Curated annotation (Swiss-Prot):
An individual GO BP term: translation
SUPFAM superfamilies: L28p-like
PANTHER family: 50S RIBOSOMAL PROTEIN L28 (PTHR39080), LARGE RIBOSOMAL SUBUNIT PROTEIN BL28A (PTHR39080:SF1)
Keyword Ribosomal protein: yes
Record protein name field: Large ribosomal subunit protein bL28
GO molecular function: structural constituent of ribosome
Pfam families per UniProt: Ribosomal_L28 (PF00830)
GN (gene name): rpmB
Entry annotated with the keyword Repeat: no
Lineage summary: Bacteria, Bacillati, Actinomycetota, Rubrobacteria, Rubrobacterales
GO cellular component, one term: ribonucleoprotein complex
Assigned keywords, A-Z: Ribonucleoprotein, Ribosomal protein
Family named by the database record: Belongs to the bacterial ribosomal protein bL28 family.
Length: 71
């Protein structure tokens, strides 16, 4: 599976790196992808999500249950 955002589908973009003499060489710009655990359909899964989707709360992160304190 390619490294693309699970939420928005953002992947690498391609273009040219330009030197001072304007010689063009191909390069790629990668999105800021983070591997996070999300809840989906009652199940927890680890997926790649871009930082802008995490900041915009477009995915629901999974939280680990806190064990009950013994009294």
């Amino acid at each position: 599976m390619a490294k693309v955002c699970y939420s928005c589908g953002k992947g690498p973009s391609f273009g040219n790196a330009r030197s001072h003499s304007l010689r063009a060489t191909r390069r790629r710009w990668n999105p800021n992808l983070q591997k996070v655990r999300i809840r989906e359909g009652g199940a927890t899964k680890r997926v790649w999500v871009c930082a802008s989707c995490l900041k915009g709360f477009k995915v629901q992160k999974a939280v680990r249950p806190v064990p009950a304190a013994e009294a």
